[in-house]
């Protein structure tokens, strides 16, 4: 166990402030939903979450700025997007959560929301009655007992199960190419699931902390509804970020390898920037997003194609900037662009139907979207490069976009490289 040296003094002051706020609230004898806020010194959010026993748990470390948030528990839950949007507009309070790949929604107003940036740490407590008001003091004291993060041990998996081995994967790709050739599809994104059975259980918080160190330039996320299955990942892809009516989104598609040789990596980068298939695959995503947002934006600007370098792979990326119409709503943006052609295909509904016929597993949260939604600003990542950690078992996902001209074996190599970003954190090669 460890504690930052000056955290105790911050906690003592914060508890005193909170007691005063709670006393004033209780004097009003109301069941109105309210927010209490206190400031703390910087806290290791993953270490804090690791020591908590309440669920659900949510964590998001943002990609493009030094900002992170963690959420614990649920005061209210929403499975209907429209009700979630109405709640935000009426209360002004934020929600965390997202959509699974197939569109199942889950958003919560947490009991505790911890927001952290380079200015400090702000803790919000959402309460709606006397009992929950009194509970906030106990919740605040949980910062006294941070559970130290541990180094992630490398181990040789006892057993590995591939949802699709190389041969089956090539069959899947060939099925997809038949659909593309027939004109049913322009693009489809196939995914694979690999399950590792381990001698030593993996702690999801230690795993994500290690991924934060090694997989830079990514969003790092965690979503857990219970202690038995924790969804984590380090994704390079933004679904969208909104501040007032300014919308930022992107097309991230097209992949090449990264090697230990700088010369080979640069050669792959040059090839990627000039490869017709990959450039087309990326542009299809741009067209899909622009088409789906056309009724919600007043202007739409697309950057030139760039490289997005990562530890194991590099991608093509085009950044998109749009001004929303006066009557924008985050839920309408979510409905319009999730899932994008970067994780599903084109046309979207046809691609999703064919994926359900080819793939032999339920994606669940994989290739879904997770984030935070509020009245002023919202941000969501695309939940790829992800895994379910389930004690002695970890299920890792990776996908590849299939278009006319795709080669099955090359696509197999691509998903192996993508999955390696997480697998290399815990698995030793035999």
Swiss-Prot record:
Cofactor: Mg(2+)
Superkingdom, natural source: Bacteria
EC number(s) given by UniProt: 5.4.4.2
Family annotation (InterPro entries): ADC_synthase, Chorismate_C, IsoChor_synthase, MenF, MenF-like
Keyword list, A-Z: Isomerase, Magnesium, Menaquinone biosynthesis, Metal-binding
Catalytic-site annotation from UniProt: 187 (proton acceptor), 237 (proton donor)
GO MF term (any one): isochorismate synthase activity
Catalytic activity reported: chorismate = isochorismate
Pathway(s) the chain acts in: Quinol/quinone metabolism; 1,4-dihydroxy-2-naphthoate biosynthesis; 1,4-dihydroxy-2-naphthoate from chorismate: step 1/7; Quinol/quinone metabolism; menaquinone biosynthesis
Keyword Magnesium attributed: yes
Function per UniProt: Catalyzes the conversion of chorismate to isochorismate.
HAMAP family in the record: MenF (MF_01935)
Family classification: Belongs to the isochorismate synthase family.
Name of protein: Isochorismate synthase MenF
Gene transcribed to yield this protein: menF
């Amino acid at each position: 166990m460890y504690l930052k040296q000056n955290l105790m003094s911050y906690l003592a002051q914060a508890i005193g402030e909170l007691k005063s706020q709670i006393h004033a609230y209780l004097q009003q004898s109301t069941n109105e939903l309210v927010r209490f806020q206190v400031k703390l010194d910087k806290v290791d959010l993953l270490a804090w979450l690791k020591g908590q026993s309440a669920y659900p748990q949510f964590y998001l470390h943002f990609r493009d700025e030094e900002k992170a948030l963690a959420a614990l528990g649920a005061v209210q839950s929403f499975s209907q997007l429209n009700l979630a949007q109405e709640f935000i507009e009426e209360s002004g309070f934020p929600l965390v959560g997202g959509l699974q790949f197939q569109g199942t929604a889950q958003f919560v107003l947490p009991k505790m929301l911890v927001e952290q940036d380079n200015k400090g740490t702000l803790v919000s407590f959402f309460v709606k009655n006397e009992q929950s008001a009194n509970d906030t003091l106990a919740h605040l004291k949980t910062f006294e007992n941070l559970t130290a993060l541990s180094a992630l041990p490398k181990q040789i998996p006892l057993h590995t199960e591939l949802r699709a081995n190389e041969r089956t994967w090539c069959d899947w790709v060939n099925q997809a190419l038949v659909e593309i050739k027939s004109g049913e599809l322009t693009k489809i994104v196939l995914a694979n699931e690999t399950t590792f059975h381990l001698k030593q259980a993996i702690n999801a918080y230690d795993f994500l902390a290690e991924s934060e160190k090694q997989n830079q330039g990514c969003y790092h996320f965690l979503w857990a509804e219970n202690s038995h299955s924790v969804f984590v990942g380090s994704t390079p892809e933004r679904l969208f970020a909104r501040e007032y009516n300014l919308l930022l989104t992107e097309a991230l598609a097209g992949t090449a390898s990264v090697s230990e040789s700088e010369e080979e990596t640069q050669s792959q980068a040059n090839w990627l920037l000039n490869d017709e298939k990959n450039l087309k695959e990326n542009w299809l995503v741009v067209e899909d997003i622009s088409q789906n947002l056309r009724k919600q934006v007043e202007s739409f600007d697309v950057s030139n194609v760039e490289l997005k370098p990562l530890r194991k792979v590099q991608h093509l990326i085009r950044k998109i900037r749009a001004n929303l119409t006066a009557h924008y709503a985050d839920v309408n943006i979510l409905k319009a662009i999730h899932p994008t052609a970067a994780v599903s295909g084109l046309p979207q509904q046809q691609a999703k139907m064919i994926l359900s016929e080819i793939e032999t597993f339920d994606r669940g949260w994989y290739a879904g979207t997770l984030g935070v939604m509020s009245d002023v600003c919202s941000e969501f990542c695309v939940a790829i490069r992800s895994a379910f950690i389930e004690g002695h078992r970890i299920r890792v996902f990776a996908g590849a976009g299939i278009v006319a001209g795709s080669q099955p074996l090359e696509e197999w190599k691509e998903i192996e490289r993508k999955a390696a970003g997480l697998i290399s954190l815990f698995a030793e090669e035999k």
